[in-house]
């Protein structure tokens, strides 16, 4: 690395574990961190207010970290990583342990700063989080990268497709298809077939069993399903 100081200025890191000074007000923490990156106190305070307001913790600015909830500590660490306007933000499990409402709020914030030009590297075990936020995705299995592609390519790579089928009569024969069929109730089922199987073929097979199809809906494959498929290859 030829220019470590310049590189450091370009990167913000949010670790999974809390590493905060528990005994000083969080606004003071932000000013101190800003100083490390060459910001004046005035500049650091201005940026802190902007970040704290965006993250919903401005009203806690005079509190110490030990007085904050887990979700507030998480947001403080995100603000701390952004105090110097980095070009790259590395997030390690940023929404671990937070409730659903806060997770959605944080996702919106990540989308906002990404749209503003910040590149984000996100590590997460929440596959829905990856699907919602990521444009490119790598799946690592036992230390090996088994997939590294744009999200749209990954989501279309599944060899299976799932449909919800509604019929006008009772489904009694699960052997209509060789593929996986899960009976939801008397007149509907969830059917997983090869991607090459057309809707016409599905309807024809039901008709051959004297069952009329009223409706057939595509159920989008979830990233969880694709993850299992990729890691079991």
Task: Tell where the protein language model's regions lie, with residue ranges.
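Conserved ABC ATPase "signature" region
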Residues: 31, 35, 42-60
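Conserved ABC ATPase signature
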Residues: 64-68
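Hydrophobic anchor residue at the start of the ABC signature
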Residues: 78
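Conserved catalytic motifs of ABC-family nucleotide-binding domains
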Residues: 85
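Catalytic Walker B motif of ABC-type/P-loop ATPase nucleotide-binding domains
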Residues: 89-92
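ABC transporter nucleotide-binding domain
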Residues: 107-193
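Short, charged/small-residue-rich alpha-helical element at the C-terminal edge
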Residues: 159-233
